[in-house]
UniProtKB/Swiss-Prot annotation:
Keyword Signal attributed: yes
Protein family per UniProt: Belongs to the non-disulfide-bridged peptide (NDBP) superfamily. Short antimicrobial peptide (group 4) family.
Major place of residence: secreted
Protein name: Peptide ToAP4
Sequence positions bearing Lysine amide: 39
Further details from the record: The primary structure of the mature peptide is identical to that of Antimicrobial peptide 6 from Tityus costatus (AC Q5G8B3) and TtAP-3 from Tityus trinitatis (AC P0DRB7).
Taxonomic source organism: Tityus obscurus (Amazonian scorpion)
Propiece residues: 40-74
Role noted for this protein: Shows anti-inflammatory activities, since it decreases release of pro-inflammatory cytokines, and increases release of anti-inflammatory cytokines. Acts by blocking the Toll-like receptor 4 (TLR4). Also increases MHC-II expression in LPS-stimulated cells. Does not show antibacterial activity on Mycobacterium abscessus subsp. massiliense. Does not show antifungal activity. Has low hemolytic activity on human erythrocyte and low monocyte cytotoxicity. In vivo, does not induce immune cell migration.
């Protein structure tokens, strides 16, 4: 084989190996995603906690606006 063909073959093998390693590194995260999707209950609790935090934030913003409205303008 000529050196040009060997270099081309080397790069092709390198690209395929890189793609395979990327695919194999995705497998654990895919399994973790499937497990969390099957459980499901934890996600609902997380969303409920986020909604509660958002409501608290809205309440604090309203209190801050009310406080700023009471301050005198200079």
């Amino acid at each position: 084989m000529q050196i040009k063909h060997l270099i081309t073959l080397f790069f092709l093998v390198l690209i395929v190996a890189d793609q395979c390693s990327a695919f194999f590194s995705l497998i654990p995260s895919l399994i973790g995603g499937l497990v969390s999707a099957i459980k499901g209950g934890r996600r609902k609790r997380e969303i409920a906690a986020q909604i509660e935090q958002y409501r608290d934030l809205q309440k604090r913003e309203a209190e801050l606006e009310e406080l700023l409205d009471r301050l005198p303008m200079f």
